[in-house]
Amino acid sequence: MINCPVDNQMNNSDVSQRPHHEVVIVGLGPTGATLANILARYEMDVLVLEREESVYPLPRAVHFDDEAMRVFQSIGLAEGIGRDARVNVGTKFVDRDQKLLLDWPRPQEIGPLGWYPSYRFHQPDLEAELNRGIAACKTVTLHRGASVTAVADLGDVVEVGYSHDGAKQVVTADYVIGTDGAKSVVRAAMDCEWEDLGFQERWLVIDVQLDKPRPDLGDFTIQTCDRDRPTTYVRCPREWRRWEISLWPEEEADDVTTDEFIWPRLRPAITPDEGRIARKAVYSFESKLATRWREGRLMIAGDAAHLMPPFLGQGMCTGIRDVANLAWKLAAVLRWKAPDSLLNSYESERREHTRTYIETAVRVGEMMNSAETAEALTHAIRPDGAAQMNSISRDLDHAIGPQGDEMSGMRMPQPRLDTGELLGDAMAGRFAVIGPDEVLESVTLPPENIAVAISAEAHSEVAEALSDLGIIAMILRPDFYCFGSVRPQNSSGLSDVLAEFKKQVHS
């Protein structure tokens, strides 16, 4: 039995008589809300337990990327989320004299994933859209103001105890997913430790709502690299702006959150008569990975599984990738009769992938603390003496799929079908078996509730994508990574890929 402290409410009663759900999600931040929306597409019976009574009304996370947007697309919420967001133009790293050290421009065109590569957003807007999606899901039950007091894995089922509306409740679930942040009760129930990757700094985060537009402040994020006091300026949607200021070890939170400390550091950019400070908080930026992401029927995702400095804007994005990976595997086990061992691949695929993002964010943070301009110039030198940074695009390590297939775990582009819809819309949470008609007609395809067949001959951008990849057919996962591929010299190979697919994903 795996326990966090168990109340008496968990004892002396028949487990079979308790309300049962297929999945219980603990925590309703963006990661948990996205997971609930995805699972609803598979008509899963989901209970979400969130301790807060309402959505936090002020900004926290401020960035997501095209991969996250593709997941939002898969749950039918991309239009609303995109309407409230702002396409991000990029980041400039400068020294204390504002000399450009490193440029990180973000493309202003739709990218290969079908969306702009980078967005700035207002988190209350995002959470409102995600919660709107949950409200429309008939199979998802949400309890706000619910404090989880106990989690116990009994082997064939998980017991969850919680307080809600003044009463103690106990339910059971096939699986419990902790998306409940750095102090996760689910991670505690797993008795799971942190692996510390060595970065810890205290920063003051200030969110300002301007009284009127200030185009002179610029649209680029500005990272000021200064050994004494690194700072960050972020252009957020509408009239929201963020400043982040590194703190010295001896500076106390009560002292640095005063107007006397803050406003002199925001001048000359803005003054008190040009906007109001909506939020001021001291954060500890850390770099940590949970040593295990699964223990029996308990799993963790998002900040419950990893913490990273914000310098890449990938913290929330990583949580979205977590649940996109995990959700379809839960569907495979609970709906498609896949072996429970498939869920082990959640940790093996996601943990080291996440490590890359954390380590890169740490390097950026170290660069911001550098006194030497040369240390920032780690990429190709441009004629003006500044370097240009490229975005991370990482495939999965140890991905499931046919043994020896180098494309298994590779992140795939999203072509537009000749019908006008994006490929992900046609997939609707399923796998896609993609290839020419002759190849598709030569095999027995999975049931339509598991996979959709996409003809390369009927859709020109699909055919072009396969050609660019040097393959003639593939199976694309619901999280848009490749399961397996077929090379031109092996036109009969799709049957082998499908055999492996049936072995690993459904029976």
PLM features per residue range, with description:
Residues 144-158:
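A conserved short coil-to-beta-strand element within the FAD-binding core of flavoproteins
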Residues 60, 65-133:
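Active-site-adjacent segment of FAD-dependent monooxygenases/related oxidoreductases
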Residues 32-33:
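N-terminal Rossmann-fold NAD(P) dinucleotide-binding loop
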Residues 2-22, 26, 41-42, 73, ...:
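Helical substrate-recognition/capping region of FAD-dependent monooxygenase/halogenase enzymes
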Residues 253-318, 353, 357-360, 489:
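FAD/FMN-dependent oxidoreductases across multiple families
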Residues 132, 150, 175, 179-285:
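Conserved FAD-binding catalytic core of PHBH/FMO-like flavoproteins
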Residues 19-21, 166-175:
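Core beta-strand elements of the Rossmann-like FAD/NAD(P) dinucleotide-binding domain
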Residues 40-60:
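Glycine-rich FAD pyrophosphate-binding loop
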